[in-house]
């Protein structure tokens, strides 16, 4: 009886394998799929990196974190007040699935009581203005104030060209600011 079942089983396997083959490729892991959609992969990676950086607990309005994604390589850029934020950002991005290599080019700003005082004064000048105060009510204010050796740089996104110019005007009016560099982008042109 067993001898009769074996040839039938072999015949079933041989006839069924061509019918199953097209479905087998659907069960392959996405990592082994050589035809992954690079654009979607890149978009997902950018979204994940941005999300992880925004979740950092000590990321403030006085820090600027940016990044660049090239394939599966991420480069962290920007300036931070606390050295721990640099290492926290690196650890958060390293933990993202799909990041093969990471370059951390985040600059830690020098400790200076004068710069701290200038940061607070520029913050008050910008976010104390009635036309710009709405940017301060967000979970992460969109105008970042970077101060290094008395030089102020504004980073982030605003809604209009007039808001960009007003923020620059308010920061320039603060005493003890040697220079103000306005790197703010307008939301409609940032897309």
Task: Kindly give the residue locations of the regions a language model identified.
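N-terminal targeting leaders
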Residues: 2-10, 18-191
């Amino acid at each position: 009886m067993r001898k009769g079942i074996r040839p039938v089983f072999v015949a079933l396997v041989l006839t069924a394998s061509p019918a199953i083959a097209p479905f087998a490729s659907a069960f392959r892991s996405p990592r082994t799929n050589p035809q992954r959609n690079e654009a979607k992969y890149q978009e997902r990676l950018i979204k994940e990196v941005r999300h992880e950086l925004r979740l950092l607990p000590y990321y403030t309005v006085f820090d600027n974190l940016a990044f660049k994604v090239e394939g599966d390589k991420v480069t962290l850029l920007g300036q931070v007040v606390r050295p721990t934020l640099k290492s926290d950002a690196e650890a958060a991005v390293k933990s993202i699935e799909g990041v093969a290599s990471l370059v951390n080019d985040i600059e830690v700003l020098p400790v200076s009581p004068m710069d701290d005082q200038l940061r607070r004064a520029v913050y008050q000048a910008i976010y104390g203005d009635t036309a710009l105060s709405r940017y301060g009510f967000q979970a992460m204010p969109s105008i970042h104030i970077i101060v290094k050796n008395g030089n102020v740089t504004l980073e982030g996104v605003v809604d209009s060209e007039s808001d960009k110019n007003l923020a620059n005007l308010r920061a320039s009016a603060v005493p003890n600011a040697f220079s103000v560099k306005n790197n703010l982008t307008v939301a409609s042109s940032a897309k």
